[in-house]
Amino acid sequence: MKNAVKNYFKNIFAECSKVELVWWWLLRGLMVFGIIDTIVNGKDYDGSNPVIQMFANLLGMFAYEICQLFPKKNRMRLLSPRFQNITALGFFLGSFCGAYLNFYYIVPGFDKILHALGTAEAVYIGYEYVAATQLKFKKTCPHQIATLCSLGLGFVFSSAWEVFEFTYDQFFGGDAQHWSYANALKTAGGDPSKIFNLFLVSDPMRFALMDTMGDIVLNFVGGFIMYAILCIIPYRHKGKGDVNAKILREHAEERKSEYEAATV
């Protein structure tokens, strides 16, 4: 058991740079501070419970470490730690800035910005997942196909997030979708013209619908921007991180071993 724990941390430190570890723990530390401060001082918040949201997203900040608990050949175990540089920031912006600092209601368009960034992040994670899948099955793949797959996965992830928000609001009394016109109007000082929305809302009854449609439009925009970036810079399919080259080397080593075994 002791050796297993030792090897677990050894694998993590071997794959991650010191800069990455500092980055992760800086964001995690701020999240812990926000949770403790909210519990001790009982901050008011217009939306869902910030403690629950921050604690759940704090766990999400350990995604890479959790992935390392999977069996060695599992594709989750094969994910690069690079993905957590982005996901940790996403969780931080959504929970610490959004829930703890209440940016969702006091910063115009904050939720919309996060939706664009979130789907861009989802496409990025999808790209890493495709690369991990290649490593698992030892199959090469042109970067054009890999990036197209990542786009599809990104939209699946963003749709899953919308389902999560709906479920949380519908069955647990939350405001994850920020559908509450009353909260938005209160934050705007009672002036409907000061409520930020991507589309004009002439009827308060359409506020929630227009908010969700704005989210979907920006999901689309953010996802395609990241897709374009990955098409231009397919970093997992060129240079030192080229998974295709790694797979071809492994195939060559296997053939060499088979040849040597056959000639003995």
What is each model feature region?
Residues 2-213, 220-264:
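Bulky hydrophobic segments
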